[in-house]
Each structure stands twice: as C-alpha cells, then as structure tokens.
C-alpha cells in the first residue's frame, strides 16, 4: 500500500470512528498532488458536508495530526 493510500485510509477511519463528529460518513478524504512539476507536493484534502462548523474543525485537526507533514486543505461545506 502506498504511503498516501495508508494516510488517506487512516484519517478516514479515525474521522468515521469519532463519535463526536456528526455526519462523519459525509466527509471524504483524498491525498492529491499540488503544484507544477518539479515542485509538486502531496496534500490531504477534506471534502463533503456537515451541519456544524465544529465537525469540520474536528475533522481538520484529525487530518493534520495524521497527515505526516502534508498540508491539509479543508473544503468541507457547512450547511
């Protein structure tokens, strides 16, 4: 398993297992390339939607803790 795949799976599992995040099943995690070669880097991207901004913040904090130094981009919509 690629390191990026492992990180993606780990972050998604931790978010889904967190009982304090309502609607965790509506949060999606990906590890994407950002930038132009030869200066590309991997970033962790959070997408989806939640009802409370605190859920988006919690997911972002979890991702940052497990991103292995990668930047986290939080694109979770709050409705």
Residue ranges and their predicted role:
Residues 1-79:
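N-terminal targeting leaders
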